[in-house]
Amino acid sequence: MATATIALQVNGQQGGGSEPAAAAAAAAAAVVAAGDKWKPPQGTESIKMENGQSTGTKLGLPPLTPEQQEALQKAKKYAMEQSIKSVLVKQTIAHQQQQLTNLQMAAVTMGFGDPLSPLQSMAAQRQRALAIMCRVYVGSIYYELGEDTIRQAFAPFGPIKSIDMSWDSVTMKHKGFAFVEYEVPEAAQLALEQMNSVMLGGRNIKVGRPSNIGQAQPIIDQLAEEARAFNRIYVASVHQDLSDDDIKSVFEAFGKIKSCTLARDPTTGKHKGYGFIEYEKAQSSQDAVSSMNLFDLGGQYLRVGKAVTPPMPLLTPATPGGLPPAAAVAAAAATAKITAQEAVAGAAVLGTLATPGLVSPALTLAQPLGALPQAVMAAQAPGVITGVTPARPPIPVTIPSVGVVNPILASPPTLGLLEPKKEKEEEELFPESERPEMLSEQEHMSISGSSARHMVMQKLLRKQESTVMVLRNMVDPKDIDDDLEGEVTEECGKFGAVNRVIIYQEKQGEEEDAEIIVKIFVEFSMASETHKAIQALNGRWFGGRKVVAEVYDQERFDNSDLSA
């Protein structure tokens, strides 16, 4: 039918149409005719598509292998995560731009008759002053230092929103200065007080306020005056494993506390490493600042200072970090969905692989889902954060996902066979007096007064047992020879397997004639061997010297920090 129609059209146009048009019509008719003559080979099936048409042949695809299916699921998960991140970033940027636009419009309208109400005008001025107070100028930066180094040095004072380094387009290097913007003004104030003239990359950096602070100085002074009415202090560089109650128990040694709150991330629910404490008396806040600033709590040096702004809930974003509430809710829902999918996928895989009576599925599933967070002991020196080394394999714990019912996780029968053996092993490893506390007992421990800091430190240090022993006051620098390392290795080998021995000479000053002390570090394969060696060697006399044997922090040792 199509061939006949086109042929009629061609014949109808032969008289009055042009030759190119006739040739094109004839070519089209030939193509259609060829299509009508072609038939699919026998034995093939047609596939009917959504638009009603059918394909001539069925393209058979091989089934996916289990590895390909797993890779496909991972790709889908990654795509979903990236989509969530993209949406959150866009919403956050739009939210911040809207706030900036509102402030700019407020400033413009205030310059032309001020149609805003007095309360709105004051709020806009205070927001602008707070934004300026969150920024610090950093000058005299060595040209080889990058943004990562600046961030690492200034991060202990509080979360950094942005670092703006000015770059030279000709030399492709920065111009030696930068602006660091924090989330809260107190972080910028602490950085200003403690980082000015600090040696960084061989130079003494200069830290000060931006040059445009002058126009906001009256509002800043007013905020500082209002802050004096509240006995609040700012605490930063808080260990991630510490809770509000832990910090409160440590700081209430200086006086009665009215409130203690750590700022939290709305997406993860974890605190952001800083918070505010309000005392009933001004003297208590002063004592806390003078005593707790640069206090080593769990391997991180606390940064403590007076609050420079009053509590202003009306002027702060609805959610911490400036994230819109809708974005926070969306992120939480998406995260829960991904977690649920992981739980279902993990349960399905284990259901096909597990052998009844041999391995408990709950113990197997604990590795990807329920690994406990490792303790972070991450400071070589005040203001410097080092890398994190996992302490030991995570303890298997089954954590059920919200909204997901998994029959495999519910009371496996083989778990009861393994528990008596586990209890017997614990009895052999730990005497009754030295048995470690259960995690639930540690979470509800009650500590206060002067011993609070010691108790919190013990709670943190229990999570990572060190295998390193340090021997002090054992030899003089002049007594060091080639045989000393072998002698120490042989002597300490009586208590366990020695991985390595390091003899470290530490100079106690910059002067040429400064005293040099010798530390000998011995790393064992197990923490129990370390404790056994310390008990045997501590207090022993060696060459007329009384040896001091102590446990050395594992994280410092792993990061080659032998200065403690």
Swiss-Prot record:
Domain description: The third RNA recognition motif, called PUMP domain, is atypical and may rather mediate homodimerization and/or protein-protein interactions.
Major place of residence: nucleus
One cellular component (GO) term of this entry: cell junction
UniProt region (Inhibits transcriptional repression, interaction with ERCC3 and apoptosis induction), positions on chain: 82-564
RRM domain residues: 134-212, 231-309, 467-554
Protein name: Poly(U)-binding-splicing factor PUF60
Molecular function GO terms recorded: DNA binding; identical protein binding; RNA binding
Crosslink position(s): Glycyl lysine isopeptide (Lys-Gly) (interchain with G-Cter in SUMO2): K48, K85, K424, K463
Pfam entry (one): RRM_1
Amino acid composition bias (Basic and acidic residues), ranges on this chain: 432-442
Annotated positions of the Phosphothreonine modification: T65, T319
Stretch list, region Inhibits homodimerization: 1-521
Keywords: Acetylation, Apoptosis, DNA-binding, Isopeptide bond, mRNA processing, mRNA splicing, Nucleus, Phosphoprotein, Repeat, Repressor, Ribonucleoprotein, RNA-binding, Transcription, Transcription regulation, Ubl conjugation
